């Protein structure tokens, strides 16, 4: 169990190190995925502040979704974060998938964000 956690932390650190190298001051779209929900936020690492956030736990999103653990829910959250980011004046971001594979819900969130108007 401890080895799995260490491997996850190494993967996450490797991805973040790569992102820092090519960020050029752009905000970071960070994704967190649990077994039942999906969360994302756009973070300004220079200031250490969250600029925009969205999750499948929000009341408006829960009404239309049976669960937050589906690909459809992730795509809706991606479109929502993009809509909020565009309203806040953010168009270009760096996608931070964390230690997760770019597949399934993480990929659906990224596709939804692109459809909503974010560039990465």
Curated annotation (Swiss-Prot):
Keyword Ribosomal protein listed? The answer is yes
- Please name the InterPro entries in this protein's record: Ribosomal_uL18_bac-type (IPR004389), Ribosomal_uL18_bac/euk (IPR005484)
Keyword list (alphabetical) reads: Ribonucleoprotein, Ribosomal protein, RNA-binding, rRNA-binding
Q: Name one GO biological process term.
A: translation
Instruction: Give the record's GO CC terms.
Output: cytosolic large ribosomal subunit
Question: What domain of life?
Answer: Bacteria
Q: Which GO terms describe its molecular function?
A: 5S rRNA binding; structural constituent of ribosome
State a single Pfam family of this protein: Ribosomal_L18p
Can you tell me which family this protein belongs to? Belongs to the universal ribosomal protein uL18 family.
Partners and quaternary state? Part of the 50S ribosomal subunit; part of the 5S rRNA/L5/L18/L25 subcomplex. Contacts the 5S and 23S rRNAs.
Q: Which HAMAP family match?
A: Ribosomal_uL18_B (MF_01337_B)
Q: What does this protein do?
A: This is one of the proteins that bind and probably mediate the attachment of the 5S RNA into the large ribosomal subunit, where it forms part of the central protuberance.
Protein name in UniProt: Large ribosomal subunit protein uL18
Protein species of origin: Beijerinckia indica subsp. indica (strain ATCC 9039 / DSM 1715 / NCIMB 8712)
């Amino acid at each position: 169990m401890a080895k799995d956690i260490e491997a996850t932390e190494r993967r996450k650190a490797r991805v973040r190190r790569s992102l820092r190298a090519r960020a050029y001051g752009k905000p970071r779209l960070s994704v967190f995925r649990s077994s039942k929900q999906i969360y994302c936020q756009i973070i300004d690492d220079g200031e250490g502040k969250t600029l925009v956030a969205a999750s499948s736990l929000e009341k408006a999103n829960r009404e239309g979704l049976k669960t937050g653990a589906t690909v459809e829910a992730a795509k809706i959250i991606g479109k929502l974060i993009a809509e909020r980011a565009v309203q806040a004046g953010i168009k270009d971001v760096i996608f931070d998938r964390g230690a997760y594979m770019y597949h399934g819900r993480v990929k659906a969130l990224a596709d939804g964000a692109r459809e909503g108007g974010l560039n990465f």
